[in-house]
Amino acid sequence: MEKFEGYSEKQKSRQQYFVYPLLFQEYIYAFAHDYGLNGSEPVEIVSWNNKKFSSLLVKRLIIRMYQQNFLDNSVNHPNQDRLLDYKIFFYSEFYSQILSEGFAIVVEIPFSLRELSCPKEKEIPKFQNLRSIHSIFPFLEDKFLHLDYLSHIEIPYPIHLEILVQLLQYRIQDVPSLHLLRFFLNYYSNWNSFITSMKSILFFQKENKRLVKFLYNSYVSEYEFFLLFLRKQSSCLPLAYSGTFLERIHFSRKMEHFGIMYPGFSRKTLWFFMDPLIHYVRYQGKAILASKGSFFLKKKWKCYLINFWQYYFFFWTQPRRIHINQLANSCFDFMGYLSSVPKSPLLVRNQMLENSFLIDTRMKKFDTIVPATLLIGYLSKAQFCTGSGHPISKPIWTDLSDWDILDRFGRICRNLFHYYSGSSKKRTLYRLKYILRLSCARTLARKHKSTVRTFMQRLGSAFLEEFFTEEEQVFSLMFTKTTLFSFSGSHTERIWYLDIIGINDLVNPLN
């Protein structure tokens, strides 16, 4: 615990000061407006309350901020809500929205400077490829040979709003900025309630998207802070001894063999060298923690997490938020995939001089499968097929042109193949493709008052093939000259597209 407090104080020492004066600079609000227009993520509202950005309005805002001590009134007299008083032109919701976006830009600056000015800590180069913290795709491709249990964690949310301000206080000691943040939270939610209501949270998220993202990321970073600390503590010491080996898996095998050959070797000393192998990934407000050890050790981890949340965030956490499953028997939903960690046999032939050996190794790796029942249910709900998967026509689309009908069906099919290209078994995707193609043909035949057979004989099957081309075929044309890997007919190779993380409706690909 003393090491954790020392590590925490070291991080807190990198606090930044005086970000509040930046709110009086006009370019901050122009930058916030440009970010909303040119941001990497799509936004629904391109201007504040459907009003165009005006430098004149921003200048009026800054002048009135100089003239009136609105921050002092908002803190000392929170019931008056002077900043958002509609009777006064300055205290309007429009100016509050401008301040919210500008504040979100300003408060991110210290965190960006900390990343740029933070000195690089001493690292072992050979260990970089073994870390899987905060990275979804390396986590999915990792080998879990020495791991035994998976802990599914639901990150607690929402929490008391004052705790969000206190978490930022560890990183920023600018008191006026913290008071301004309290003011925004006080206006958009019920400050007297211990747990914020979901209705106020949804409204606050809609009106202050950038600020909400910043607050949530700050909260999650503090939540993950102790996990990163334990990761460094558990990995730093063994690295001095395992750094000479090519992979940690070989080091673990050699240490186990060393304990068998030398029974007098202290078990405590053996554990001193072994790495606990903590694998962690976060997604959609949830987290997965895979580690080595007994079930009793995992129960202690669960109690530790609950006590940590109660001590650090000052609220009671329900134990059902953490589920512990054995790695070999766990099957769960992960980003829209049906995931499990089965044991797959791997035969390796070892040739030593004139002797040949066959080594049977059991590998444990993430297996991602397309949820066929769930997706067919979505197609049935959207009236593409029946509940049993039998294709039907889409009557509501018969008023569209042939090109629009083909484009809509083809886009849905390509989106399915794009998102679920990371599946190790793609036969379900081909079944969904068959449903969509036949549903498209029946929709076109119904529009032209014909049968599917007559319609296909008149136009040919190639008429639909152009619009239902999987992206794997495109990759096969790109890599035919550079690699021996074949995409055509491959049902086990996985292709991960990085943009699927930014998809909001991960489970429902039809939106």
Swiss-Prot record:
Native species: Hordeum vulgare
HAMAP family for the chain: MatK
GO molecular function: RNA binding
Main function: Usually encoded in the trnK tRNA gene intron. Probably assists in splicing its own and other chloroplast group II introns.
Pfam families membership: Intron_maturas2, MatK_N
Keywords: Chloroplast, mRNA processing, Plastid, RNA-binding, tRNA processing
GO biological process, one term: tRNA processing
A Gene Ontology term for the protein's cellular component: chloroplast
Main location: plastid
InterPro entries: Domain_X (IPR024937), Maturase_MatK (IPR002866), Maturase_MatK_N (IPR024942)
Annotated localization: Plastid, Chloroplast
Family: Belongs to the intron maturase 2 family. MatK subfamily.
UniProt name for this protein: Maturase K
PANTHER family reported for this sequence: MATURASE K (PTHR34811:SF1)
Lineage, broadest ranks: Eukaryota, Viridiplantae, Streptophyta, Embryophyta, Tracheophyta
Gene name linked to the record: matK
